[in-house]
């Protein structure tokens, strides 16, 4: 069954436009509350948010909606998405709710949910909520209305959790870091985590005003961090996005490391301490070089659909621990139940401290394959899936590339486009192959 409101990561949109309006969000919370009460007499829900100005309005709407259904609410204030996931589990709450649109600009916002175990909820739960939304609200009587309170030390509790994921016998003393929180949810906690572990920390992107989240800073705008790291002669820069569930890392030379490289480094660190993973989950976009390197270590790479939700589903299905995306969503399920930019950064820095090597030295054996992406606009009614010329050219190119590259052709989920991606060890070959494939999709002239 198709979901009406939920996307791949909760419900998201422009504030003031359906569905991100206060009246809908109140109805949403009421519907969620009714779903929760089918299995629990008096549920408790935690609500956290990022730093968007609309968070105040949506937080109030959620609180009212839950209370009207007889659900108690605990307000966490500004806190990273993975912090809400952790506290939901630690506080034995029924559900965690995050008000955030992640890496989007401030006019957007969204609502996403975590289970009592701190994991993202499945399609069946979302469909149950959407079904409840179609029903008339049933307000509980006054004696059974929910209550709300604030957990004032939520940031401190999450800081301690993050520190607990770093090896007890190691510190970050002697390391100089620049932390960029994208003027987002981690603006308080991220600098403190690294400082309390011994690092010398300077901060950028840590002065939110409600309107500047992700604006020119953070994981999706790393140029500011590169400039700060090189200017301050820091060892590393750590860039998070607005809700701090993704990571980009910069070294002293200004080199930017993406999620694929950092995932491999986390795997290599486990191997070095005798804890070799059975397998790793990436996505359709994970660079071929990572697959080749992992195979050389006797480790299987399985590709999930793009989206950290699908990486997590594949990890849980196989009972594996490590996975991630090139965008910097990294999962280490023996450390946390969801992607966490701060925890991921600590795993990378732990590998450096334990080995005495830099990130660049630890990744010296990895050279990412050049990747060429061409978007081909489709004409109305064009059937690209049954294009014999495309199928034939794809077979020829895959034979040419062998294990030294790959082809990925997929439709855009939002536009009438086909995305043609080719990876090869040689950039010119990748470009040539991508152009050959794209040409088969061009309309006849």
Curated annotation (Swiss-Prot):
Catalytic residues identified in the record: 102 (phosphoserine intermediate)
GO molecular function, one term: phosphoglucosamine mutase activity
Phosphoserine PTM sites in chain numbering: 102
GO terms classed as biological process: carbohydrate metabolic process; peptidoglycan biosynthetic process; UDP-N-acetylglucosamine biosynthetic process
The keyword Metal-binding is assigned to this record: yes
Chain residues that bind Mg(2+): 102, 241, 243, 245
Record PTM text: Activated by phosphorylation.
Keywords for the protein's UniProt record, in alphabetical order: Isomerase, Magnesium, Metal-binding, Phosphoprotein
Cofactor note: Binds 1 Mg(2+) ion per subunit.
EC number, as in UniProt: 5.4.2.10
SUPFAM superfamilies assigned to the protein according to its UniProt record, in alphabetical order: Phosphoglucomutase, C-terminal domain, Phosphoglucomutase, first 3 domains
Cofactor(s) the record lists: Mg(2+)
Annotated InterPro entries: A-D-PHexomutase_a/b/a-I, A-D-PHexomutase_a/b/a-I/II/III, A-D-PHexomutase_a/b/a-II, A-D-PHexomutase_a/b/a-III, A-D-PHexomutase_C, A-D-PHexomutase_C_sf, Alpha-D-phosphohexomutase_SF, GlmM_bact
Key word Magnesium present: yes
Catalysed reaction, written as an equation: alpha-D-glucosamine 1-phosphate = D-glucosamine 6-phosphate
Gene Ontology, cellular component aspect: cytosol
Pfam families on file: PGM_PMM_I, PGM_PMM_II, PGM_PMM_III, PGM_PMM_IV
Family: Belongs to the phosphohexose mutase family.
HAMAP family in alphabetical order: GlmM_B (MF_01554_B)
NCBIfam families with a match to the protein in the record: glmM, PRK10887.1
Function comment: Catalyzes the conversion of glucosamine-6-phosphate to glucosamine-1-phosphate.
Protein name: Phosphoglucosamine mutase
Source organism per UniProt: Variovorax paradoxus (strain S110)
């Amino acid at each position: 069954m198709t979901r009406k409101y939920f996307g791949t990561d909760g419900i998201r949109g422009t504030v003031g436009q359906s569905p991100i309006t206060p009246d809908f969000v109140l109805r949403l919370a009421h519907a969620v509350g009714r779903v929760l009460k089918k299995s629990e007499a008096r549920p408790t829900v935690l609500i956290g948010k990022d730093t968007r100005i609309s968070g105040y309005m949506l937080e109030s709407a959620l609180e009212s909606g839950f209370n009207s259904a007889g659900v108690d609410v605990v307000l966490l204030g500004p806190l990273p998405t993975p912090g809400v996931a952790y506290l939901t589990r630690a506080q034995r709450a029924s559900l965690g709710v995050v008000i955030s649109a992640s890496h989007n600009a401030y006019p957007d916002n969204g609502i996403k949910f975590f289970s009592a175990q701190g994991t993202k909820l499945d399609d069946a739960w979302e469909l149950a909520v959407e079904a409840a939304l179609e029903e008339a609200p049933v307000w509980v009587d006054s004696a059974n209305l929910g209550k709300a309170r604030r957990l004032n030390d939520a940031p401190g509790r999450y800081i301690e959790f993050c520190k607990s994921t770093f090896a007890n016998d190691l510190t970050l003393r002697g390391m100089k870091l620049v932390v960029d929180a994208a003027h987002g949810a981690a603006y308080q906690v991220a600098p403190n985590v690294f400082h309390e572990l011994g690092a010398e920390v300077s901060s950028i992107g840590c002065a939110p005003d409600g309107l500047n989240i992700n604006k020119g800073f953070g994981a999706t705008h790393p140029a500011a961090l590169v400039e700060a790291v090189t200017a301050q002669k820091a060892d590393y820069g750590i860039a998070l996005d607005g809700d701090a569930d993704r990571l980009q890392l910069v070294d002293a030379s200004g080199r930017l490391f993406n999620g694929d490289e950092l995932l491999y480094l986390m795997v290599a660190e486990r191997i070095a301490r005798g804890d070799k993973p059975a397998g790793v989950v990436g996505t359709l976009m994970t660079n071929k070089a990572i697959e080749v390197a992992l195979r050389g270590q006797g480790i299987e790479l399985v590709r999930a659909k793009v989206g950290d939700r699908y990486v997590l589903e594949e990890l849980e299905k196989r009972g594996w621990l490590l996975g991630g995306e090139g965008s910097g969503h990294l999962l280490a399920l023996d450390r946390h139940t969801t992607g966490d930019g701060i925890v991921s950064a600590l795993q990378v820095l732990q590998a450096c401290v334990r080995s005495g090597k830099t990130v660049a030295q630890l990744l010296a054996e990895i050279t990412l394959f050049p990747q060429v992406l061409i978007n081909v606009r489709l004409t109305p009614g064009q059937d690209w899936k049954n294009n014999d010329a495309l199928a034939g050219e794809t077979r020829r190119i895959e034979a040419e590339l062998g294990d030294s590259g790959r082809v990925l052709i997929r439709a855009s989920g939002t536009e009438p486009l086909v995305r043609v991606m080719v990876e090869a060890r040689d950039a010119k070959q990748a470009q040539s192959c991508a152009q050959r494939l794209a040409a088969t999709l061009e309309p006849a002239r």
